């Protein structure tokens, strides 16, 4: 049974829209959430994913605000996070409401000029659901800066970015309040899914509201105001900003947006989201925001606001000095050609036309747009590591294969397709015996379902596992095919 604090009920009763009832709200909070996932179109199309999973008993109910999002049902009690297809990065387990903010930011009308959307900021990124959703919407083009304040959550963010094959991200680890000054008016679009009271999450955490207090709400709303102001300062004139939370009270939602409007006046233009998807008007406020109560779409509670920065605003502090000793240098023409030839000739992968950078014996691929950010802030991770070099040549890195060996593969690529059982063995760090002995082929890309799992060394009679030890799994779930239609 859900635990609803009486102080919360008293407060939210005054804010609930007239067309909704408190009884329906409480009943919705007491129901378990529907399972929902988002297909990772960086690796597989939604149609192909459904074709892959329907024989395993999955049914798909489209989420109206996300083209690649689905409520799912299937006959398995196991944790989906252990599923082979999840480990492979074909889908992300993501609550339906949390797919709203990236959709709101990347509306078709946003793409008005080819110059827009080259630099995007996700101010509070972990664990990475919205970051990787935006990476897919950007099709790994441009630069996506993903920031996370919590050190432990940066590791989770990085793991999800790599698993999903997002190659154009730069990760940072800062308090989001510094971005307005360090990267003043640098981004075409900014998403801030702000830390909040989490009132909308009660359907998956029955104790989320047990200790609710107005004092806590007031305190966190002050942090949110500082974060949205920092995000607004980091936004270019003409750019779009989406502010979202998974909470329900006005202080953390409309109140934060109204604060920004009070400070910056006509430079802040609220954009209506009433036409974002069919049925959006059911959750649209007078300001044009989406205030999603859990009973409206049978989802988590959520809030989404979109605004345009119509004019430049003064920065609050002098521009910081550029930082020195950036550890990467551009590859020479000879080095760049060498790494391109290795990927093309040995692996069958055409490298994207991006910056090839060198650090010691490491070769990296950076988005072109990152040039404008060198020295302005310290980055935890940039782009993807392509390979290590030695006197014997190059050694490809796992993350490069995961990010680039999908749509970039040529017909001549050295790949070995494995069964689901063999894929499970591979992900558990084991070598794969080959049914028929053949001539040794050296480095090969191991694939399952048309998407890469990683590298192996073809020794003729087996595939020697080259999966990095830190990625070896203790458990991999194979979802069984169903013998009856569902």
Curated annotation (Swiss-Prot):
Tree of life domain: Bacteria
Q: What is this protein called?
A: Ribosomal RNA small subunit methyltransferase F
The alphabetical list of record keywords is: Cytoplasm, Methyltransferase, RNA-binding, rRNA processing, S-adenosyl-L-methionine, Transferase
Q: Give the originating organism.
A: Shewanella baltica (strain OS223)
Principal place of residence: cytoplasm
Q: Name one Pfam family in it.
A: Methyltranf_PUA
Alphabetized InterPro entries for the sequence = Methyltr_RsmF_N (IPR031341), MeTrfase_RsmB-F_NOP2_cat (IPR049560), MeTrfase_RsmB-F_NOP2_dom (IPR001678), Nol1_Nop2_Fmu_2 (IPR027391), Nop2p (IPR011023), RCMT (IPR023267), rRNA_ssu_MeTfrase_F (IPR023545), SAM-dependent_MTases_sf (IPR029063)
* Catalyzed reactions per annotation: cytidine(1407) in 16S rRNA + S-adenosyl-L-methionine = 5-methylcytidine(1407) in 16S rRNA + S-adenosyl-L-homocysteine + H(+)
Question: Where found?
Answer: Cytoplasm
Report the family membership.
Answer: Belongs to the class I-like SAM-binding methyltransferase superfamily. RsmB/NOP family.
Binding positions for S-adenosyl-L-methionine per the UniProt entry: 124-130, 148, 175, 193
* GO biological process terms, semicolon-separated: rRNA base methylation
Q: Where is the active site?
A: 246 (nucleophile)
Q: Recorded E.C. number(s)? A: 2.1.1.178
């Amino acid at each position: 049974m859900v635990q609803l604090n009486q102080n919360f009920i008293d407060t939210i009763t005054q804010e609930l829209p007239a067309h909704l009832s408190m009884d329906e709200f409480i009943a919705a909070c007491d129901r378990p959430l529907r399972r929902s996932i988002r297909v990772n179109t960086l690796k597989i199309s939604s149609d192909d994913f459904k074709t892959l999973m329907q024989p395993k008993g999955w049914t798909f109910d489209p989420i109206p605000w996300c083209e690649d999002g689905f409520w799912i049902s299937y006959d398995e009690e196991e944790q989906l996070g252990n599923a082979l297809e999840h480990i492979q990065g074909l889908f992300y387990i993501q609550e339906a409401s949390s797919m709203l903010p990236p959709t709101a930011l990347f509306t078709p009308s946003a793409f008005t000029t080819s110059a827009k959307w080259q630099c995007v900021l996700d101010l509070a990124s972990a664990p990475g659901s919205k970051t990787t959703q935006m990476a897919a919407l950007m099709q790994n083009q441009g630069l996506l800066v993903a920031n996370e304040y919590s050190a432990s959550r940066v590791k989770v963010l990085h793991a999800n970015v790599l698993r999903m094959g997002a190659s154009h991200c730069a990760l940072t680890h800062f308090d989001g309040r510094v971005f307005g000054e360090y990267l003043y008016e640098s981004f075409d679009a900014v998403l801030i899914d702000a830390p909040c009271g989490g009132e909308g999450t009660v359907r998956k955490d029955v104790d989320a509201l047990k200790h609710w207090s107005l004092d806590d709400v007031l305190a966190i709303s002050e942090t949110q105001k500082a974060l949205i102001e920092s995000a607004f300062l980091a936004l270019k004139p003409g750019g779009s900003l989406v502010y979202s939370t998974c909470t329900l009270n006005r202080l953390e939602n409309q109140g934060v947006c109204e604060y920004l409007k009070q400070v910056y006046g006509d430079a802040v233009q609220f954009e209506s989201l009433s036409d974002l998807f069919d049925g959006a008007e059911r959750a649209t406020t007078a300001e044009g925001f989406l205030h999603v109560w859990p009973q409206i779409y049978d989802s988590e509670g959520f809030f989404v606001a979109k605004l345009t920065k119509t004019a430049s605003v003064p920065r609050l502090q002098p521009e910081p000095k550029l930082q020195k000793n950036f550890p990467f240098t551009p590859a020479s023409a000879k080095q760049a050609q060498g790494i391109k030839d290795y990927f093309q000739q040995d692996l069958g992968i055409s490298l994207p036309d991006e910056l090839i950078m060198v650090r010691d014996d490491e070769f990296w691929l950076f988005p072109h747009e990152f040039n404008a950010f060198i020295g302005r802030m310290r980055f935890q991770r940039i782009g993807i590591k392509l390979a290590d070099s030695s006197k014997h040549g190059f050694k490809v890195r796992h993350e490069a294969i995961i990010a680039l060996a999908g749509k970039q593969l040529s017909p001549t690529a050295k790949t070995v397709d494995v069964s689901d059982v063999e894929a499970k063995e591979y992900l558990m760090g084991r070598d794969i015996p080959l049914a028929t002995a053949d001539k040794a082929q050296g480095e090969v890309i191991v694939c399952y379902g048309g998407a890469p799992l990683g590298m192996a060394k073809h020794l003729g009679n087996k595939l020697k596992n080259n999966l990095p030890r830190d990625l070896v799994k203790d458990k991999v779930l194979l979802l069984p095919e169903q013998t009856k239609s569902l």
